[in-house]
């Protein structure tokens, strides 16, 4: 995944050193874009090993509309532990906004179901959008959404997705985000009877934390390997019926994992 390494190198070479909410400090750029052709392999980073189980379970958790980490803990996924309260709650984060966006009249809007219906009925629509950024509820969220809004696009029988990510932790978060939204695009395409097209990743503040510089330099020394292939159970035609066992990754041969601290 040369595109990811190019982003990392660009930030190290051209970024601006800034302070941040966590007190760690970052080097960042504003405005950047990467594109991944999902017909050329599954964009799971090969220059360090990623925990695919966490990526899949987190996505399934989002799609359930869940905002308590119990499901994640039950499946040995700890990526949200630092932000949950004593009861495991995170407030109205991604899953709530995706599946239960509160309307002023008391209704709750299922954005994912609505977009699915529109892709099938009106694929040329320019309103195939899901937003997790709800200004009225941001202060109630344990962590305001970093991957804030995504849009689908249908052309030539293929479904593509563009994500706008307002804040991007390049070393730890972005590899997960790429794989998660690529997988979501593939799942959406399957249940809509389409092929997967491109995943387009657009950033606002893309940053490397200062305590990740050494790890980034190590990763930049590694040569990317061939991308793996993600096999999805073709029998599943309901987006909300997918289970962890419906996904099988083939040909993943990454370089070793690189440890790095999370800034909370």
Curated annotation (Swiss-Prot):
Keyword Membrane found: no
Intracellular or extracellular location(s): Cytoplasm
Pathway: Pyrimidine metabolism; dTTP biosynthesis
Cytoplasm found in the keyword field: yes
An MF annotation (GO) of this entry: thymidylate synthase activity
Record-listed dUMP binding positions: 21, 126-127, 166-169, 177, 207-209
Taxonomy, superkingdom: Bacteria
InterPro entries (alphabetical): Thymidate_synth/dCMP_Mease (IPR045097), Thymidate_synth/dCMP_Mease_dom (IPR023451), Thymidate_synth/dCMP_Mease_sf (IPR036926), Thymidylate_synthase (IPR000398), Thymidylate_synthase_AS (IPR020940)
Active-site residues annotated for this sequence: 146
CDD domains: TS_Pyrimidine_HMase
Assigned EC number: 2.1.1.45
Reaction(s) catalysed (UniProt annotation): dUMP + (6R)-5,10-methylene-5,6,7,8-tetrahydrofolate = 7,8-dihydrofolate + dTMP
Binding locations of (6R)-5,10-methylene-5,6,7,8-tetrahydrofolate: 51, 169, 263
Main location class: cytoplasm
GO biological process: dTMP biosynthetic process; dTTP biosynthetic process; methylation
Function: Catalyzes the reductive methylation of 2'-deoxyuridine-5'-monophosphate (dUMP) to 2'-deoxythymidine-5'-monophosphate (dTMP) while utilizing 5,10-methylenetetrahydrofolate (mTHF) as the methyl donor and reductant in the reaction, yielding dihydrofolate (DHF) as a by-product. This enzymatic reaction provides an intracellular de novo source of dTMP, an essential precursor for DNA biosynthesis.
HAMAP family hit by this protein: Thymidy_synth_bact
NCBIfam families linked to this entry: PRK01827.1-3, PRK01827.1-5, thym_sym
Assembly notes: Homodimer.
PANTHER family: THYMIDYLATE SYNTHASE, THYMIDYLATE SYNTHASE 1
Family: Belongs to the thymidylate synthase family. Bacterial-type ThyA subfamily.
Protein name: Thymidylate synthase
């Amino acid at each position: 995944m040369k595109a990811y390494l190019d982003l990392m190198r660009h930030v190290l070479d051209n970024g601006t050193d800034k302070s941040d909410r966590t007190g760690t400090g970052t080097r960042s750029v504003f405005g950047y874009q990467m594109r991944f052709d999902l017909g050329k392999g599954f964009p799971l980073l090969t220059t360090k090993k990623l925990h695919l189980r966490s990526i899949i379970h987190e996505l399934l958790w989002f799609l359930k509309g869940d905002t308590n980490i119990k499901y994640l803990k039950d499946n040995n996924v700890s990526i949200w532990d630092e932000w949950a309260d004593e009861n495991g709650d995170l407030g109205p984060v991604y899953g709530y906004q995706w599946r239960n966006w509160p309307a002023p009249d008391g209704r709750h809007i299922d954005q994912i179901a609505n977009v699915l219906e529109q892709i099938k009925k009106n694929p040329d629509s320019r309103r195939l959008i899901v937003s997790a950024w709800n200004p009225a509820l941001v202060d109630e969220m344990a962590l305001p959404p970093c991957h804030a809004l995504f849009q689908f696009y249908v052309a030539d029988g293929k479904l593509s997705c563009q994500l706008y990510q307002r804040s991007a932790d390049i070393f730890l978060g972005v590899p997960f985000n790429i794989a998660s939204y690529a997988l979501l695009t593939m799942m959406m395409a399957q249940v809509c009877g389409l092929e997967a097209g491109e995943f387009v990743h657009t950033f606002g503040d893309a940053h490397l934390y200062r305590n990740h510089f050494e790890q980034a330099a190590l990763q930049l020394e590694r040569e990317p390997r061939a991308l793996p292939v993600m096999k999805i159970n073709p029998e599943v035609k309901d987006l909300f019926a997918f289970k962890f066992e419906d996904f099988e990754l083939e040909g993943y041969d990454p370089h070793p994992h690189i440890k790095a601290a999370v800034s909370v």
